[in-house]
Amino acid sequence: TAGYEDEPSHTVTTVIVPHNAKSGQLVNYLAYIDSNGAQCAPSYSMRQGSKFLNDDLLNYQQLLFSTFLNEGWILTIPDYQGPQRAFAAGRLEGRMSLDGIRAALNFGEIGLEKNTSVVTYGYSGGAIASGWTAALQASYAPEINAIGFAMGGTPANVTSTVQSLDKGVFSGLCVAGITGIIYAYQVVQDWFQNHLYPKGNDAIEYARSHCITDIFSRYPFSHVFSDDFFRNGSSILYDPTIQSVISDIVLGLKESETPKAPVYMFHSQHDEIVPFSDARKTSHNWAKHGADVFFQEFSDLPIGHALSEITNIPNSLFFVRDRFAGKPFPKGYTRKVTGNGLEEPNASLAGLGELVRAIQDIQGREVGPADSELKQFILDRN
């Protein structure tokens, strides 16, 4: 793959082929990593024996990708932050994601054709990658047969996201985001060398070796943008060097970066982590530039960042299912407000069943034919 400045780079993608795999259908699943430790990448955290198999965030995400596997869809789950573990560096993440799709299509043993239909899904930090996959696909990987992009709780503007998180319970995300941007851009890394105070340097070093739950617990209610962490800490986001980078990773600003396939976005109006207004602005800009966008808002007060995804599993599933089925998608811009994802008429019963099955998956429900294929293989050999 390639870094932000087109320098050669590399990463890993994990491909999961279900027992009932459907040919010609691939889901590009972008897990939220939201941290900078090498061990936090999906290719590490999903390995048998990894302590992160007991991690709540990973198990929570398995709700959805287990559901996708039950549908028979092959998954590619890339380490889209790359070797620099560059969380929040959207353009780089988009490239890594697209090259992960290319790798899956090119790996003959999986049996995917070059014209395989691909749908991308990402939530929260994964939505940064999903959004930039959508924005860059037409120019960076036009040969990919992308038929849909789904994203929720989308941090469309990194600047306003970290500003809203600073001094709050999730301020550790500020540390992780800054660390990711530093290691994605050499110009930012050079700039920070002259602006780091010991506390800031310690925070970045900690983030580079830990995952998000540890970062959350170490830096709650921290005033990251202060002179405790950085020289002129309150104004670093407005420094010309930093501005030149972060202003270029705002989703939806450039008409040339408009998704060519249908886009489904969902977001709580009361999201306490990612600003709702930024995602809505991106949806408007994309539609203004010619994209077909369905933007779903959740108005129930208890539906914040975490509950938005879990209650919307049925609608996310139906979006992917409908894209593979070739069903029509609304043209232009569509906005829909519901209390929560389960209030959709088509999600109330069928969707609730999917949600129950998804929860059963992470509680240990058996998926697939167990060892029947292995037994048959042994019989055949004998």
Swiss-Prot record:
BP terms from Gene Ontology: lipid catabolic process
Reactions catalysed: a triacylglycerol + H2O = a diacylglycerol + a fatty acid + H(+); a monoacylglycerol + H2O = glycerol + a fatty acid + H(+); a diacylglycerol + H2O = a monoacylglycerol + a fatty acid + H(+)
Keyword field: Disulfide bond, Glycoprotein, Hydrolase, Lipid degradation, Lipid metabolism, Secreted, Virulence
Entry GO terms, CC: extracellular region
Active site per the UniProt annotation: 124, 271, 305
Keyword match Magnesium: no
Record EC number: 3.1.1.-, 3.1.1.3
Main location: secreted
InterPro entries linked: AB_hydrolase_fold, Lipase_secreted
Cell location: Secreted
Domain of life: Eukaryota
Induction notes from the record: Constitutively expressed regardless of pH conditions or exposure time.
Disulfide bond residue pairs: 40-211
Entry GO MF terms: triacylglycerol lipase activity
Glycosylated sites: 115, 157, 232, 346
Assigned protein family: Belongs to the AB hydrolase superfamily. Lipase family. Class Lip subfamily.
Matching PANTHER family: LIPASE 5, PTHR34853
Protein role: Secreted lipase that hydrolyzes acylglycerol lipids such as triacylglycerols and consequently releases free fatty acid. Can hydrolyze 4-nitrophenyl palmitate to release 4-nitrophenol and palmitoic acid. Due to an absence of fatty acid synthase genes in Malassezia species, secretory lipases are essential for the yeast to generate free fatty acids from degradation of sebum and assimilate them as lipid sources for growth. Plays important roles not only in lipid metabolism but also in the immune response of host cells and pathogenesis.
Listed name of the protein: Secreted triacylglycerol lipase LIP5
